[in-house]
Amino acid sequence: MDYFTLFGLPARYQIDTQALSLRFQDLQRQYHPDKFANGTQAQQLAAVQQSATINQAWQTLRHPLTRAEYLLSLHGFDLASEQHTVRDTAFLMEQLTLREELDDIEQSKDDVRLESFIKRVQKMFDARLQQMVEQLDNAAWDAAADTVRKLRFLDKLRSSAEQLEEKLLDF
């Protein structure tokens, strides 16, 4: 059973996240291993496995990028273990330039410049995310997979910038 079916949701990118959370809580209560403490060893093991599956499904579907990756996996794209890389040279050069800029910001410890950088990267991420949503809605799986690969770069860059922000604030 796929994760969308497990939560009673349609297998599409845009989901009702409130319904997801409510169903997660219901499933957790229903399959919590403690409820099977007096059961057979097989029942206890099944409850632990089901609980782990429910938790993994929830973690996957609640985050936009992992939800997109999972949806693409249902259409034959194994982005988690694939060897495909981003082939868009302009995008890769832009990422290299942004990484260098982040390194410069770290060296200068310029928190104002860092704040501006984080906002700019977030805008880039949001624009790509919207592009990906449209591609998924239109079943443009190849294009969506490529956009997810690009979003991974931006997500990693954003995370690095936020870590630097925390580091600079600790001073």
UniProtKB/Swiss-Prot annotation:
InterPro entries: DnaJ_domain, HscB, HscB_C_sf, HscB_oligo_C, J_dom_sf. It holds the Pfam family HSCB_C. This is Co-chaperone protein HscB. One of its GO terms (biological process) is protein folding. It comes from the Bacteria. Co-chaperone involved in the maturation of iron-sulfur cluster-containing proteins. Seems to help targeting proteins to be folded toward HscA. GO terms for molecular function: ATPase activator activity; protein-folding chaperone binding. Residues 2-74 form the J domain. Keywords: Chaperone. Belongs to the HscB family. It comes from Salmonella newport (strain SL254). GO terms for cellular component: iron-sulfur cluster transfer complex.
